[in-house]
């Protein structure tokens, strides 16, 4: 038996991680059962830790803090099989980055000279008049003096020459803004949008690049381009700029054999006269190809010290992935539009032959309107946005001859791009690139219904489109790391893609942005300046509970206690805040012994996005049962977390609180365990969160089933309860109803969007209405959570705490179904197929795992590793 798919801290051969303890994981091959393992860790070719032979079937291990900064390390492992025979050694490599104290350079600000910005480029021509109009309206309404427009700025370029000898060379680099770097004209690394998305006034992350092959003996030149990035671009629905400061900066050091040979300092030169004339994450990028080649306008820089914490590269990089060729079409109103066939987050590469000064402008959007014309109106909030909306523009000012432009410092959500140009497009090539964090697709589901298959593909694409360093709600309007979205999607997200590193990074941002009183920022990292209602809405149950739900799910899937330890204080503080809301309940609001465990005060989003209920109605009249339900549910989970961390007293306290919250829920929101409501969500949540007794849950499920049938098999659940709906129905014997909900072709239902040609999951059930008019975002991953039931219910795969159960729920409406899940333990397959009334099952179990299988006819058995037909 041998170990395969070795990972260090959930990463494959990571470079630049922080020093500290390591979480090592692997899978098994060429055997049946692992009975023991042995691990040896080396740092800079010296053995620093040996486990010895450990009698265990676990496929992960924790090490002590074996690696310092700047370490090139490795670990090797061998396994013993069921016959106590050792296998061959397998090896993996890792490398640590710099510690905070290792940085010797200074922060360099390149913008020390006045920048001439004509303002006639596409982005400023769009933003300036809108800004000035809105400011004039603000002043006229007596809401303050009009503020002057700040033009969008060109990228900066910085250079430094240095002499070096050949050797093992590493570049350590980070930026306030985004950077791209070249050594002697060769691009460094394949990460885009580096260093990534952070709460930039509280911390940043740095990358480590192996530049040994790029370094020359003798004279070398390092060139860096610096863009606005998340640091000071427009952001969110309000279009706020300079969120983390109005000054960009870069910090780096290039080392050869562990010694700095080139660091950021005041000997550098900078210019703003390069081809990137404007750049903004949300609004777009303007590129003047006439300025390519030798850069001019070099001037001095300003340096400064900053004690801003800098962490290593503890996640996966953002990369370019799939490429989509553009197909030119003419719309009814005569516009030239590119259709790339897939709604993505990314950008467009342009290649064409043109004359000097000719321009090509692309405006990117998700849909065509009801008349077949290009539109962006579905995702705009032009009234709120300070610059009149999200531009999503790319402009190329051409040089003579062949032109090539691929954006460096922007990303946008789109399927279509409107083309405006005075150049000949006969031989032009437009290619869209999907840009997202480097996550492998780990879940595949196919069945006999093409629309369901498309729904799964759409869900994967919405995850790709919104997991760009941190999870966001949409890649167009808000681009916000909403807690609520992640809370309802994490289980499904971990199945569809290997998103653990992205979720782990996002949780660090959540911790940094938690309020002193324990409430959770709804969005992390911040993407707008807080409004007056922001602190009130940051107390929302279900949203704040992501602080518990997300790390809990990650631990149950991987067994890594570090995710619990890192986030335990955040979990505790949020739960204490939620309990504090309950403690404010007055006798007038609720009587009885458990009134102080009933969450009735404060603002909540409530169920959110229920069909027939507007967002404003939901906010003004949230479902009061939600807070108490989460006080019970999250309390149980937090008790489990405390137990895992060895905090028995905490665990007992949280269990007591959760039990009291259940009693409070029953007293306030049921009549002796009977729910009286016309909304499906109240039944779903009560059953899913075990707020009722078993017989009461059966009765509630029966009522829920009847309500769904009376609603012509349409759901009317909202944001928080929809992920549980089909699972709850199937669990209590109403799988046929769950399937009818799944296959409902009309809105509200999952397949309505598929029928409208969607290639991603929508924000609302009617993102494109019956008249063909698009509304709201057309790339929101949260409703893709239904895929969790396809894997865990339809095909029955559930992997948690290192154990695998399979309990499929076949139905003739699909004819056949097959789910493949590349779990932390290896590939799991569960499938079934009807032949008349006979169902045949096929299963595949990875090495070192068994599966406890339960079939609908009551048969129960355990499967060993291998392929099985039943």
Segments and roles (model prediction):
Residues 170, 347-366, 420, 484-514, ...:
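Alpha-helical support elements that line or immediately flank enzyme active sites
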Residues 177-178, 260-267, 271-272, 416, ...:
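Active-site acid/base region of carbohydrate-active enzymes
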Residues 246, 251, 268-291, 312-322, ...:
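Non-catalytic C-terminal accessory modules of carbohydrate-active enzymes
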Residues 179, 187-190, 194-195, 510, ...:
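Active/binding-pocket-proximal capping segment
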């Amino acid at each position: 038996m041998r170990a395969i798919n070795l990972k260090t801290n959930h990463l494959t051969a990571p470079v630049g991680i922080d020093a500290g303890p390591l979480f090592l994981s692997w899978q098994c091959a060429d055997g049946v059962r692992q009975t023991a393992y042995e691990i040896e860790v080396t740092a800079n070719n010296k053995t620093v830790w040996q486990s010895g032979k450990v009698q265990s079937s676990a496929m992960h291990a924790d090490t002590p803090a074996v690696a310092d900064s700047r370490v090139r390390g490795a670990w090797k492992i061998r396994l013993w099989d069921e016959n106590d025979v050792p296998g061959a050694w397998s090896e993996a490599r890792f490398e640590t980055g710099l510690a905070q104290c290792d940085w010797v350079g200074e922060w360099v600000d390149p913008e020390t000279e006045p920048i001439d910005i004509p303002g006639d480029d596409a982005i400023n021509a769009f933003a300036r008049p809108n800004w000035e109009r809105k400011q004039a309206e603000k002043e006229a309404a007596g809401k303050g003096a009009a503020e002057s427009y700040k033009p969008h700025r060109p990228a900066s370029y910085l250079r430094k020459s240095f002499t070096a000898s050949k050797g093992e060379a590493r570049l350590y680099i980070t930026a306030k803004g985004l950077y791209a770097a070249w050594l002697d004209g060769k691009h460094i690394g394949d990460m885009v949008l580096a260093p990534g998305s952070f709460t930039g006034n509280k911390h940043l992350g740095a990358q480590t690049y192996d530049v040994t092959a790029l370094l020359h003996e003798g004279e070398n030149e390092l060139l860096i381009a610096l863009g606005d990035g998340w640091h000071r671009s427009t952001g969110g629905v309000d279009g706020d700029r300079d969120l983390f400061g109005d000054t960009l900066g870069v910090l780096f050091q290039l080392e050869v054999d562990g010694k700095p040979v080139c660091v950021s300092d005041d000997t550098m030169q900078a210019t703003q006269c390069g081809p990137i004339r404007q750049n903004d994450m949300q609004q777009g990028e303007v590129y003047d190809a006439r300025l390519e080649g030798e850069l001019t306008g070099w001037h001095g820089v300003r340096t400064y010290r900053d004690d801003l914490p800098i962490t290593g590269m503890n996640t996966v990089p953002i990369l370019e992935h799939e490429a989509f060729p553009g197909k030119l079409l003419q719309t009814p109103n005569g516009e030239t539009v590119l259709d790339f066939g897939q709604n993505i987050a990314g950008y467009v590469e342009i290649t064409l032959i043109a004359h000097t000064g000719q321009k090509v402008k692309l405006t990117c959007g998700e849909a065509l309107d009801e008349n077949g014309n290009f539109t962006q109106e579905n995702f705009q909030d032009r009234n709120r946005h300070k610059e009149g909306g999200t531009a999503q523009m790319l402009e190329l000012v051409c040089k003579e001859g062949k032109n090539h432009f691929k954006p460096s410092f922007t990303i946008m959500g789109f399927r279509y791009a409107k083309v405006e140009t005075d150049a000949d497009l006969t031989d032009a090539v437009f290619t869209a690139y999907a840009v997202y964090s480097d996550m492998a697709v780990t879940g595949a589901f196919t069945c006999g219904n093409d629309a369901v298959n498309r729904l799964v593909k759409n869900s994967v694409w919405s995850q790709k489109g919104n997991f760009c360093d941190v999870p966001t709600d949409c890649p167009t309007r808000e681009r916000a790391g909403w807690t609520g979205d992640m809370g309802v999607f994490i289980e499904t997200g971990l199945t569809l893609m290997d998103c653990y590193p992205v979720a782990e990074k996002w949780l660090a941002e959540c911790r940094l942005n938690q309020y002193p009183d324990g409430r959770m920022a709804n969005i992390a990292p911040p993407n707008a300046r807080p409004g007056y209602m922001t602190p009130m809405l940051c107390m929302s149950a279900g949203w704040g509970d992501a602080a518990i739900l997300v790390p809990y799910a990650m631990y149950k899937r991987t067994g890594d206690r570090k995710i619990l330890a890192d986030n335990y204080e955040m979990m505790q503080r949020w739960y204490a805040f939620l309990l504090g809301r309950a403690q404010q309940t007055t006798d007038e609001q609720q009587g009885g012994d458990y009134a102080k465990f009933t969450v009735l005060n404060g603002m909540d989003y409530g169920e959110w996005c229920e069909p027939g209920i507007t967002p404003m109605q939901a906010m003004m009249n949230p479902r009061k049962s939600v807070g108490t339900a989460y006080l019970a549910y999250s309390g149980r989970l937090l008790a489990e977390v405390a137990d895992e961390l060895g905090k028995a007293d905490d665990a007992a306290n949280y269990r007591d609180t959760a039990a009291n919250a259940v009693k409070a829920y029953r007293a306030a929101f049921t009549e002796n365990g009977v729910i009286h409501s016309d909304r499906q969500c109240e039944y779903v949540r009560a059953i899913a969160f075990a707020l009722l007794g078993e017989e009461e849950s059966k009765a509630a499920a029966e009522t829920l089933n009847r309500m769904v049938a009376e609603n012509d098999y349409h759901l009317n659940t909202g944001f928080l309860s929809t992920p549980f709906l089909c699972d709850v129905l199937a669990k209590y014997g109403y799988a046929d109803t769950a399937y009818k909900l799944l296959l409902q072709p009309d809105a509200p239902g999952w397949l309505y969007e598929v029928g409208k040609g969607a290639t991603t999951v929508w924000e609302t059930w009617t993102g494109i209405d019956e008249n063909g008019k698009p509304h709201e975002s057309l790339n929101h991953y949260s409703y893709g959570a239904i895929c969790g039931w396809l894997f865990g219910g339809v095909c029955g795969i559930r992997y948690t705490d290192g154990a695998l159960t399979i309990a499929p729920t076949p139905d003739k409406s699909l004819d056949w179904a097959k789910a493949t899940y590349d779990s932390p333990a290896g590939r799991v397959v569960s499938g079934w197929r009807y032949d008349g009334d006979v169902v045949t099952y096929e299963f595949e179990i990875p090495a070192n795992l068994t599966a406890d299988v339960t079939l609908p006819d009551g048969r129960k058995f355990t499967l060993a590793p291998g392929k099985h037909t039943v």
